């Protein structure tokens, strides 16, 4: 057992660097706990506000005996041109702050270097979010391997890799609306340029940031991926080959949350009472509820959110609708009240204004569908719970995830969104799916057609495979063992 080796021979010490955004931090905290369960000493480096988000979950883990510690560093906000006190991606109020935020999180090299000089035992490996490219310099200085974590699936990572190697495909496109086929892919898949991460032209400072990220990717020792072999075997195999064997699929990492409190508080404390939420779900028929959540950084204009709400109402199906970033959606709150929407749907619609206990909700027997923005965390949680997906991608890797879910795995239905909704440009795009389109998509997903039944059957089977993957002897469990053995050999050869 690797856990025995780490205790008896050379104590492994992994230092984890999560990017300061909710969707990036959540799986990284899960990874910390998974590795600590194998006897690896874990140090998480983050800022005070981000540490506070996960205080309850990590405190329970530490109290249970897991060797996890958190080191807090001050983000140089003002030096990078940010307002004082901004430490999280979600707290950015405008597009203009994105570049300063990226610069700020990558100005931590000097304080982190000092931390490494004082750490004991000496770190044997870095696991870093791909956005924090400065960690490559730390790894090089201290002669330790750096493992990248992208937070994406193998399908998306392979797509990005193939297009980097065949850049003429993107260069020859006449417009951002022109479709192209990804070459050398196990399945025929078409995209437009904006639908692929880092494929569009980036002006000014953004291009420099991208180049730093790509260079850090090239110099990394390997990659861990929050997916499982059985979900996307062809893509996992091809991506591992592209990374010269140094790619380990270790997910779904969310399944390390076995205690009810950990599930309820994964990512943040829920803004609804857990018992109230479960009581509402208990009152609904099995498989009847549509869970609706467009992510922690929902960039959807008010006009579109109104159409979504009216479509949910006209579907006549029970639903839970999570509206996050609530302080940014005051106009929607007013519409809920003034239009009578909240009153009309009160008997079959539960509105959660803020953070929801998503894992608990998806695991409930009354939930039969998940309308999602296709962020990889949410996509994987839905599949792991055996829930078919209604896809509504917005940005970055989410269109890749939609293609995987709808075209390759055939466990989802597209709501019809094909245009990227860039932050700050929501109102320009306006309504992409009207209320009739929403109603039609909900019926297609939740109905009793042969296709709907087949989707439910397929996603249930994939959910069962997810649970087997993380059990002892499963593919993801074995890959964690393989990763630790690899790093152990490196650590011993360096000492």
UniProtKB/Swiss-Prot annotation:
CDD domains named in the record: GT1_Gtf-like (cd03784)
* Active site residues of this protein: 24 (proton acceptor), 129 (charge relay)
Pfam families according to UniProt:
UDPGT (PF00201)
Keywords annotated in UniProt: Glycosyltransferase, Transferase
Q: Name the top EC class.
A: transferase
- Record keywords: Nucleotide-binding included? no
Functional summary from the UniProt entry: Possesses very weak glucosyltransferase activity toward 2,4,5-trichlorophenol (TCP), when assayed with high concentrations of TCP.
In the record, the note on similarity to other proteins reads: Belongs to the UDP-glycosyltransferase family.
Q: What is this protein called?
A: UDP-glycosyltransferase 73C9
Q: Which organism is it from?
A: Barbarea vulgaris (Yellow rocket)
Corresponding gene? UGT73C9
């Amino acid at each position: 057992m690797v856990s025995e080796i780490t205790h008896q021979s050379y104590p492994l010490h992994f230092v984890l660097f999560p990017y300061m955004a909710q969707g990036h931090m959540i799986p990284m905290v899960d990874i910390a706990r998974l590795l600590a369960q194998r006897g690896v000493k874990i140090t998480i480096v983050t800022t005070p506000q981000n540490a506070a988000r996960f205080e309850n979950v990590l405190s329970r883990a530490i109290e249970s005996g897991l060797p996890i510690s958190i080191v807090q560093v001050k983000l140089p906000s003002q030096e990078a041109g940010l307002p004082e006190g901004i430490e999280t991606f979600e707290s950015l109020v405008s597009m203009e702050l994105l570049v300063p935020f990226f610069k700020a999180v990558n100005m931590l090299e000097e304080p982190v270097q000092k931390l490494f000089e004082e750490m004991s035992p000496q770190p044997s490996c870095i696991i870093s979010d791909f956005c924090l490219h400065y960690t490559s310099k730390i790894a090089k200085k201290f002669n330790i391997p750096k493992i990248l974590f992208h937070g994406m699936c193998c399908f998306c990572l392979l797509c990005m890799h193939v297009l980097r190697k065949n850049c003429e495909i993107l260069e020859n496109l006449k417009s951002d609306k022109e479709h192209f086929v990804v070459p050398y892919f196990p399945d025929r898949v078409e995209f437009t340029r904006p639908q692929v991460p880092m494929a569009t032209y980036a002006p000014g400072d953004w291009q420099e940031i991208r180049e730093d990220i790509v260079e850090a990717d090239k110099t990394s020792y390997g990659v861990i991926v929050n997916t499982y072999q059985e979900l996307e075997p062809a893509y996992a195999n091809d991506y591992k080959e592209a990374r010269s064997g140094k790619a380990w699929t270790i997910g779904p990492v969310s399944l390390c949350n076995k205690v009810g409190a950990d599930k309820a508080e994964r990512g943040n404390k829920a803004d609804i009472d857990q018992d109230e939420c479960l009581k509402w779900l208990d009152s609904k028929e099995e498989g009847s509820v549509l869970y609706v959540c467009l992510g922690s950084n929902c960039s959807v204009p008010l006009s579109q959110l109104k159409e979504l709400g009216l479509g949910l109402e006209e579907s006549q199906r029970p639903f839970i609708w999570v509206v996050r970033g609530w302080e940014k959606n005051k106009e929607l709150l007013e519409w809920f009240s003034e239009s009578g929407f909240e009153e009309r749907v009160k008997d079959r619609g539960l509105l959660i204004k803020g953070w929801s206990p998503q894992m608990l909700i998806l695991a409930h027997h009354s939930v039969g569908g998940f309308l999602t923005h296709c962020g990889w965390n949410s996509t994987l949680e839905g599949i792991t719970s055996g829930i078919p997906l209604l896809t509504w991608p917005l940005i970055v890797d989410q269109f890749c995830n939609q293609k995987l879910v709808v075209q390759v795995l055939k466990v989802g239905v597209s709501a019809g969104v094909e245009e990227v909704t860039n932050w700050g440009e929501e109102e320009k795009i306006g309504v992409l799916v009207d209320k009739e389109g929403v109603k039609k998509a909900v019926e297609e997903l939740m109905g009793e057609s042969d296709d709907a039944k087949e989707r439910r059957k397929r996603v249930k089977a994939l959910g069962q495979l997810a649970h087997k993957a993380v059990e002892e002897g499963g593919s993801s469990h074995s890959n964690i063992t393989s990763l630790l053995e690899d790093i152990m050999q490196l650590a011993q050869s360096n000492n």
